[in-house]
């Protein structure tokens, strides 16, 4: 709960409307009080990603940020997508990078400028499974009142949890002592 409050406080400024982030925080507290229904890792990851979206950092989860190729729909994913991690999430671009663009490009565009340092660009991407992408899409567009109303198998959770945490920390441009403490309790 302290980590969630710290993250919300970091993203809220006096000049902005803080009603959505704090409504999200209240919904998280309610979900935590009913934690028998949802695992803590799911609540944490969903909160991290949803906090980013309500604060104006909606990730591009519908297509590749490099070539614009639209991803397969959640309702009918193609076979290649189900059997492998076809897309990667770029923290620098705040969105997906398809397998073809990731493999073909010697340097991913970083904020519209090509980088000569390929290792640097690729270090800021992470592979996404279909389940993680589906969960991220749901959380990003769901109303605040329903942001945890989905299921994700524990074996599929690592991509989603890592994406949400890394995205929030990347946008915050800092770590949180309360997150370190939370991780020490595991």
Q: Can you describe what each PLM-predicted range is?
A:
Residues 1-186:
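Non-catalytic alpha-helical scaffolds and adjoining flexible linkers that form interface surfaces
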């Amino acid at each position: 709960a302290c980590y969630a409050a710290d993250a919300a406080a970091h993203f809220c400024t006096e000049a902005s409307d803080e009603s959505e982030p704090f409504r999200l925080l209240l919904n998280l507290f309610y979900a935590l009080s009913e934690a028998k229904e949802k695992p803590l890792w799911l609540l944490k990851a969903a909160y991290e990603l949803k906090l980013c979206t309500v604060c104006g950092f909606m990730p591009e989860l519908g297509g590749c940020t490099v070539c614009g190729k639209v991803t397969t729909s959640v309702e009918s994913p193609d076979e290649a997508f189900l059997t492998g991690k076809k897309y990667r999430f770029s923290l620098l671009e705040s969105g997906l990078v398809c397998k073809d663009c990731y493999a073909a490009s010697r340097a991913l565009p970083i904020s519209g400028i090509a980088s000569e340092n390929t290792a640097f660009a690729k270090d800021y991407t992470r592979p996404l499974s279909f389940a993680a992408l589906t969960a991220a899409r749901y959380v990003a567009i769901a109303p605040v009142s329903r942001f945890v109303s989905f299921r994700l198998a524990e074996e599929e959770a690592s991509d989603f949890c890592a994406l949400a945490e890394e995205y929030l920390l990347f946008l915050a441009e800092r770590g949180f002592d309360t997150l370190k403490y939370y991780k020490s309790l595991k």
